[in-house]
């Protein structure tokens, strides 16, 4: 199983996010969210509380509530900060190539902020579409613009977005489980476990043991895109070579 570096730069791993977040300047929403992101990156979502956040920015907790109404708003803001780093070029004439780039960039962003991934997956579901922060909606808007400008209908563009990001969420959760939740499961340990399976009962798993033990998240993602993008083109492209409604 190929292990990949995840999380913030190892060179700053021992820094106290509380110390890093203190600032003598005027308190504002951006400062609060940046500090919250550092805490989540280091200690996970469970390590973030309004009290700890107030200590990190060096202000009384009451001051925080002037800028963020509650912890839920902070979590939304943290997800928004990370998603703001995902760039979608909605003017790219190569819509398939742009979607491939977006998918790869999203994966890398998730590996950089693994503790934020649960927020990226769950916070939008917990917030009605019309009440989500603008930054949380930006990737959706830009992907829709990319596909609609390429000639797809709005409904088809929305369907493509849902298929792509639905897979991305599942893919990155699976990859992070492999490299973070079970770091002790080395290639040798996994192979040993697979070879202990009864070959008469699990012949396919036994046969695929080498592939299962050499999981490569980047290669898995590219394989999915190689299947998805031509399929979309074949299904939605008419004889004239232009996108057509399903």
Annotate the PLM regions.
Residues 1-56, 69-76:
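Basic, helix-initiating cap at the start of DNA-binding domains
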Residues 164-170:
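A short structural micro-motif
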Residues 59-68:
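Short hydrophobic/aromatic patch on the recognition helix
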Residues 126-151, 155-162, 173-174, 192-203:
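Amphipathic alpha-helical packing segments from all-alpha helical-bundle domains
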Residues 1-16, 149, 177-246:
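C-terminal peripheral helix-coil segments that are non-catalytic and often amphipathic
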Residues 81-86, 113, 117, 171, ...:
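A short secondary-structure junction motif
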Residues 31-38, 42-43, 72-89, 101-105, ...:
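Alpha-helical structural segments
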Residues 87-129, 134-138, 161:
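Hydrophobic alpha-helical connector segments
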């Amino acid at each position: 199983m190929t292990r990949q570096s995840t999380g913030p730069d190892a060179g700053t791993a021992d820094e106290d996010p509380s110390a890093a977040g203190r600032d003598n300047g005027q308190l504002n929403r951006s400062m609060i969210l940046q500090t919250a992101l550092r805490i989540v990156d280091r200690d996970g979502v469970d390590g973030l509380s309004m009290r700890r956040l107030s200590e990190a920015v060096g202000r009384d907790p009451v001051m925080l509530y002037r800028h963020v109404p509650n912890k839920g708003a902070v979590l939304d803001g943290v997800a928004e900060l990370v998603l703001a780093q995902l760039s979608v070029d909605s003017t790219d004439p190569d819509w398939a190539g742009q979607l491939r780039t977006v998918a790869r960039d999203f994966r890398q962003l998730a590996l950089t902020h693994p503790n934020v991934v649960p927020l990226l997956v769950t916070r939008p579901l917990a917030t009605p579409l019309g009440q989500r922060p603008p930054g949380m909606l930006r990737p959706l808007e830009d992907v829709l613009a990319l596909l609609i400008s390429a000639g797809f209908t709005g409904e088809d563009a929305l369907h493509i977005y849902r298929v792509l990001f639905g897979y991305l969420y599942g893919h990155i959760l699976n990859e992070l489980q492999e490299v973070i939740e079970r770091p002790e499961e080395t290639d040798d340990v996994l192979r040993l476990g697979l070879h202990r399976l009864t070959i008469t009962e699990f012949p396919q798993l036994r046969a695929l043991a080498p592939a299962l033990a050499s999981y490569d998240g980047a290669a898995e993602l590219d394989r999915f895109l190689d299947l998805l993008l031509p399929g979309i083109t074949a299904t939605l492209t008419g004889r004239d070579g232009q996108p057509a409604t399903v």
